[in-house]
Amino acid sequence: MQAVDFNSDMGEGFGPWTIGDGVDNELMGYISSANIATGFHAGDPGTMRRTVERAKALGVAVGAHPGFRDLVGFGRRHINASAQELVDDMLYQLGALREIARAQGVRLQHIKPHGALYMHLARDEEAARLLVENLRVIEPELLLYCMPGSVICRIAQELGQPVIREFYADREYDLSGSIVFTRNVRGYEPQAVAERVLRACRQGVVRTVEGQDLAIEFDSICLHSDTPGALDLVEATRKALDAAGIVVRAPR
């Protein structure tokens, strides 16, 4: 692998409150794409605007990061809603960030659902298809960040919506190829995460929770800003990529 995108979730505070270590400003200097929270699981209009401004200043690509209506649970709890309700909510959030970004002269590069909604769309045919069908109408060139081999990835490829397949640096995988979703995120050793990423980039494999290697193809590395010690993890990973001659750049 000669080049890869490096993305992280940004703007996931709310008013005066922050999530994780509160290191968005510093972390932004190491990534190429920012997934900006759009108000339902975290974020607010002012935070969205400031995060777009910071990304623009650093040349970081911007994407919408819509979630379930779950501020209290940070979007990590599943909400039992119809496919139409979920897509209505996602389009609402997408539109909000799109206009805030447009006011700054920034065009959205991508959309990446958050947390439990990301996992729901990875498995639910009806909601995934309805979202992609709507994206084909309103934003046919918008990149859709998703898990390789997931339901939404397959549907997007089938319908012609461009996809960016992700590798999660700070989440565990099982042999099905899925990340192991958790509400209780633990810390990681920076060097171990960096080595895991380099192994995925060079060899195309990741060690699963079952203790076996899983082949994986991806276009972007994700490392979450709310993971404990996120700044150290991102810094170590970026330095390792640079030292290996792997160029970090946004897909567009």
Swiss-Prot record:
Q: Is Coiled coil set as a keyword in this record?
A: no
* Known catalytic reactions: 5-oxo-L-proline + ATP + 2 H2O = L-glutamate + ADP + phosphate + H(+)
The processes (GO biological process) annotated in the record are: carbohydrate metabolic process
The residue stretches assigned to a coiled coil in this entry are: none
Which keywords annotate this record?
A: ATP-binding, Hydrolase, Nucleotide-binding
- GO molecular function list: 5-oxoprolinase (ATP-hydrolyzing) activity; ATP binding
EC number assigned by the record: 3.5.2.9
* Entry superkingdom: Bacteria
Task: State its role.
Answer: Catalyzes the cleavage of 5-oxoproline to form L-glutamate coupled to the hydrolysis of ATP to ADP and inorganic phosphate.
Q: Which family does it belong to?
A: Belongs to the LamB/PxpA family.
Q: Self-association or partners: how does it assemble?
A: Forms a complex composed of PxpA, PxpB and PxpC.
Q: What protein is this chain from?
A: 5-oxoprolinase subunit A 1
Q: Which organism is it from?
A: Pseudomonas putida (strain ATCC 47054 / DSM 6125 / CFBP 8728 / NCIMB 11950 / KT2440)
Q: Which gene encodes it?
A: pxpA1
